Design a protein with these regions (language model features):
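Acidic/polar-rich alpha-helix caps and helix-coil junctions
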Residues: 1-182
Length: 182
């Protein structure tokens, strides 16, 4: 049939229908959606949290709950933000909700990095803990060393791009001693 899968597949990307079969490589014509409406709501909530007034925090909370309601998410103690809302706690709740809502969409690293970088890397420990907890024991020291250098948080620009565009400059973490001929 042109494909084989072992284990679990991410059905929202592979399915033809809810109960149907997975797409074959010849049927890979999916219209990839980069921004879904729930993500737009969560982006707005993040912006409101950054504004920081209680009215903005209440509005941000309402947007997060709108996303959760649409997804039929279970209620828990962590979803109760009645009364005065703490901006840091709501921001963490938002980050967790983005992880749940946008799972497998390739956005988590950028969410965590944006969260960690805010206010001059005030929350770099969050990024470091997340990375170290998911790394094998033998890789943790090198990972800690690499991520400790803030310049490493973005990929290098490919050599072909540097050669074709004279205005581009390599990300400093990935500069080499050899000169790239443009």
């Amino acid at each position: 049939n042109g494909y084989s899968y072992q284990g679990t597949i991410i059905w929202k990307y592979m399915a033809l229908t809810r109960q149907g079969t997975a797409r074959t490589s010849q049927q890979s014509y999916a219209n990839w959606i980069f921004y879904r409406y729930p993500e737009i709501l969560l982006m707005k909530a993040e912006a409101l949290i950054q504004k920081g007034t209680q009215a903005d925090l209440q509005a941000a909370y309402a947007l997060i709950m709108q996303v959760r309601s649409r997804a039929n998410a279970l209620e828990s103690d962590e979803t109760d933000f009645s009364g005065i809302i703490n901006a840091d706690e709501l921001e963490q709740f938002l980050l967790d909700e983005r992880a749940r809502e946008l799972m497998f969409e390739g956005k988590r690293w950028y969410d965590v990095l944006r969260f960690a970088r805010r206010n001059n890397y005030a929350k770099i420990d969050y990024l470091m803990d997340l990375a170290l907890n998911s790394a094998p024991t033998g890789k943790q020291q090198s990972l800690q060393s690499k991520y400790g250098d803030h310049r490493s948080h973005y990929w290098p620009i490919h050599d072909d791009e540097l050669k074709s565009n004279q205005s581009l400059v390599q990300n400093t973490f990935y500069e080499t001693s050899t000169t790239i001929k443009k």
